[in-house]
Amino acid sequence: SVLFLCVANSARSQMAEGLARSIFGDAVTVQSAGSAPSRVNPFAIQAMEEVGIDLRTHSSKSVDTIDPASVDLVITL
């Protein structure tokens, strides 16, 4: 499984999560989180819509809610 991690979990990590889910489907568990989560950036939602990826149902999550044992690879953004 992959965890994309950034500060606010509002743009970069959300976009990476959406893109990875689009590429890997159910073959890879993909998550994103932030050290100080806020909300998903509307510009990130709009940019991903332009490439056919819907982030409208995503929400920012704290890294504290992620079980470390469930993650094989952490990518920081």
Predicted segments, located by residue:
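Mid-chain, well-packed structural core segment of small domains
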Residues: 66-77
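Conserved active-site segments centered on acidic
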Residues: 1-67
